[in-house]
Regions:
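Pre-Walker A (Motif I) flank of P-loop NTPase domains
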Residues: 2-6, 76-77
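Hydrophobic anchor at the beta1->P-loop junction of P-loop NTPases
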Residues: 9
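The conserved Walker
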Residues: 13
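Conserved glycine(s) of the Walker
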Residues: 16
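Conserved substrate/cofactor phosphate-moiety recognition/catalytic segment
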Residues: 19-74
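Glycine-rich phosphate-binding loop used to anchor ATP phosphates in small-molecule kinases
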Residues: 57-102
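Conserved phosphate-donor/acceptor-positioning beta-strand/loop module used by diverse small-molecule
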Residues: 99-121, 163
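Small-molecule kinase domains that catalyze NTP-dependent phosphoryl transfer to phosphate-bearing small molecules
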Residues: 124-174, 190-195
Length: 195
């Protein structure tokens, strides 16, 4: 069995991670495991759930997310995994998976104004987003307690590609897929994208 690839789609709130992860998984022909969707499923089995504060579902969600990834990688499934993946919270959980898969990181970025507008839009249109406290995030941003520019990306020494999601994808989806499919030969993402 050859080694599968774990494609990590990361970025701050409203940067287009989930949309890109689903599109990339479709192009690659593999599953997309979305952290927020796992939590939304947990919320469905907890009537009266309220997000915010010391959320009792955050740790079980994290455990389920990485548990599913581990099971898939152990049997050789290439997978796209999407979550914020801020360094201090997520790196300790990703590092053990590097022994099971080639790891590639995609960092979604966009202007703070665009991210803010996306958060407002999804909070209005998607009732499932209540599981994630989007309104609390917006309130914190408005009060100056949180900045969308405060995101700290994963600091792993693995091939990494930054994708601007402001207006479509830059680089384009076929190039992102080529990055995800590239062999784990130690080449820098920039060299892989030029070939």
């Amino acid at each position: 069995m050859s080694t599968p690839t774990l494609v990590v789609v990361s970025g701050g709130p409203g940067t287009g991670k989930t949309t890109l992860a689903h599109e990339l998984a479709r192009v690659l022909g593999c599953p997309a495991i979305i952290r927020d969707e796992i939590k939304q499923g947990m919320v469905m089995s907890h009537p009266g759930y309220q997000s915010g504060g010391d959320d009792p579902l955050n740790h079980p969600t994290l455990d389920a997310f990485f548990g599913v990834l581990k099971v898939l990688l152990e049997v050789g499934v290439t997978v796209v995994a999407e979550a914020a993946f801020q360094d201090r919270l997520w790196r300790p959980n990703l590092e053990p998976l590097t022994g099971l898969a080639h790891l590639r990181v995609i960092r979604c970025t966009t202007d703070a104004d665009i991210a803010h507008d996306r958060i407002i839009q999804r909070a209005k249109e998607d009732a499932h987003r209540a599981a994630h406290g989007d309104q609390e995030l917006l309130d914190s941003i408005a009060a100056g307690g949180h900045s969308l520019d405060s995101f700290v990306p994963i600091s792993l020494d693995v091939p990494t590609l930054t994708v601007d999601t402001a207006h479509g994808y830059q680089p384009a989806l076929p190039d992102i897929a080529a990055f995800a499919r590239a062999s784990d030969d130690g080449a820098s993402p920039e060299r892989m994208m030029e070939s």
